[in-house]
From Swiss-Prot:
Protein name in UniProt: Phosphatidylglycerol--prolipoprotein diacylglyceryl transferase
Binding-site residues, a 1,2-diacyl-sn-glycero-3-phospho-(1'-sn-glycerol): 230
GO cellular component assignments: plasma membrane
Role summary: Catalyzes the transfer of the diacylglyceryl group from phosphatidylglycerol to the sulfhydryl group of the N-terminal cysteine of a prolipoprotein, the first step in the formation of mature lipoproteins.
Recorded metabolic or biological pathway in which this protein acts: Protein modification; lipoprotein biosynthesis (diacylglyceryl transfer)
Coiled-coil ranges per UniProt: none
Keyword tags: Cell inner membrane, Cell membrane, Membrane, Transferase, Transmembrane, Transmembrane helix
Subcellular location: Cell inner membrane
Pfam families: LGT
Gene: lgt
Classification via InterPro entries: Lgt
Length: 492
């Protein structure tokens, strides 16, 4: 069976531009490899500062009379050993290298920074809401590590499964390292939701925490995390939409970004309109083959003599890597472009010859972030409606128990449905996922349909079948949550 050749692009493109005036970068700043001739990570400055901090803590505990030196050492030993392993073994493996392969430093990514903000904001808000709900902030703090680890693994596994060919390397070790390189981005929100949800269920069952009520506590906070997370995608230059006209919902990325490279290989930035060559094999990474349908008169392709009806190979040219200073990462090198006809070079364009900015694409990251902010407010409004005091409930208890209420779990299910609808719509304007199962629907759209259907069925069951004043416990009994003796309900 023949398939159309698709464009495959090497990773390691950096930066993005919101407009011709405003620029954001994938790398916020670079922690240099060494300072004063001594490396910062590995056996270096960071390890020295860790040792000084541990000794200072032990000395402080001993002098204030609270703990003895041996007790203080035992308390901090586990943390110190783990931190030392990270600084000496893990972090050096994430250092970027120059064109000669020498380490130049550790990149602090905008993507990672926004993920950290997402974690802090969502957990902090959830802890506050849990305290108000009578569940206690500790219920969130105990749950958070499980959720984050499960979410991170789920998001990465989902992404690697979708794009496994991009991670294949000559050896198993190199392949596994590529799959584990989270500093390069590559997380799928749905995978994170699924992994985090499964891990959370395990933790909630273990601690006998009320699942429906804690879900109602958390779901608005998930959208806060989504808001920051999608801004991280914007910084990383991923999860963008298809081509569109310039406008308030459009973004433009600079040379070096993934979308810029895609538009080079598709011929758009060269002034070519065409269709892919049909073949059983995909072209090598960084190449595309196409039949020219038309050429813009004022374009680079027209200057190079490209004609309608020709079959061309367009390839990214990495030969300009040497232009990057040796104190900067090799990933900052901008590619040139080579255009070939029947294996003969038709034109060669240096990075300076090429457009410095890509054509507009839908800013799906911005759309998703705005929707997340709106859904956060909407869920709070729905929550207020669901928890209006009634004649059959104790007003004080209902006001205090801001989650659960007369319909525990409804708020969480509404959030699931809303995100499923959003994702289906966004996938229609995104271009980074192919149709699955013989349809035009992407894997995320299929998952969305399953989530929506399951949530609607569960919502109907919860709405029709839940007692307005109780929630079922893991053991099968009921615990009164409004107007009864127990303020904290048990879960499923």
């Amino acid at each position: 069976m023949e398939v159309a050749r698709t464009v495959r692009i090497p990773h390691a493109f950096d930066g993005l531009t919101l407009s011709r005036q405003a620029t954001m970068r994938r790398t916020l700043f670079l922690i240099p490899h060494e300072f004063a001739g001594w490396p910062i990570f590995g056996i270096g400055w960071a390890l020295l500062f860790l040792l000084i901090a541990v000794l200072a803590y032990v000395g402080w505990e001993s002098r204030r009379g609270g703990l003895g030196a041996s007790t203080a050492i035992r308390q901090i030993a586990g943390f110190a050993v783990m931190a030392a392993v990270i600084l000496v073994v893990v972090v050096p493996r994430t250092e970027l290298v120059n064109t000669l392969g020498d380490p130049v430093g550790v990149a602090v990514r905008g993507y990672g920074m926004f993920l950290m903000l997402a974690a802090i904001a969502s957990v902090g808000l959830a802890a506050w809401r849990a305290e108000r709900a009578g569940l206690g902030a500790d219920s969130i703090l105990q749950l958070a590590p499980w959720t984050f680890i499960g979410g991170l693994l789920g998001a990465r596994v989902f992404y690697v499964t979708q794009y496994y060919e991009d991670f294949l390397r000559p050896t198993w070790g190199e392949t596994l390292m590529a799959m584990a390189a989270l500093n390069q981005g590559g997380l799928v929100v749905y995978g994170g939701f699924i992994g985090g949800f499964i891990a959370s269920l395990i933790a909630l069952k273990r601690h006998q925490t009320p699942i429906w009520r804690i879900g109602d506590v958390i779901i608005p906070c998930v959208f806060v995390g989504l808001l920051f997370g999608r801004l991280g995608c914007l910084m990383n230059g991923c999860c963008y939409g298809g081509a569109c006209e310039a406008g308030p919902l459009a973004v433009q990325f600079p040379a070096g970004s993934q979308v810029h490279a895609e538009q080079l290989l598709s011929g758009e930035l060269l002034g070519i309109e065409g269709h892919p060559v049909v073949s059983d094999e995909e072209p090598p990474a960084g190449q595309s083959q196409m039949v020219v349908d038309s050429v813009r008169p004022d374009s680079l392709a027209n200057q190079a003599g490209v004609k309608k009806g020709e079959t061309l190979t367009i390839a990214l040219d990495p030969s300009y890597r040497d232009q990057v200073p040796l104190d900067r990462p090799a990933e900052e090198a901008l590619p040139g472009v080579v255009v070939l006809r029947d294996d003969e070079v038709v034109a060669r364009f240096s990075p300076r010859d090429l457009p410095s900015i890509a054509d507009p694409v839908w800013g799906t990251q911005i759309i998703s972030s705005v929707f997340a902010a709106i859904m956060f407010v909407v869920l709070l409004i729905v929550e207020r409606i669901l928890h209006r005091p009634s004649k059959q409930t104790d007003d004080a208890v209902t006001e205090r128990a801001i989650t659960g209420g007369r319909r525990p779990g409804v708020l969480m299910l509404v959030g699931f449905i809303a995100y499923g609808v959003l994702r289906i719509v966004l996938e229609w304007i995104r271009v980074d996922e192919k149709g699955q199962f013989g349809t035009s629907l992407s894997i995320s759209q299929w998952v969305s349909l399953v989530v929506i259907a399951a949530s609607l069925v569960t919502l109907f069951i919860r709405w029709r079948g839940v007692d307005s004043t109780s929630e079922q416990t893991p053991g099968g009994g009921n615990t009164n949550v409004v107007g009864g003796s127990d303020a904290a309900a048990a879960g499923l």
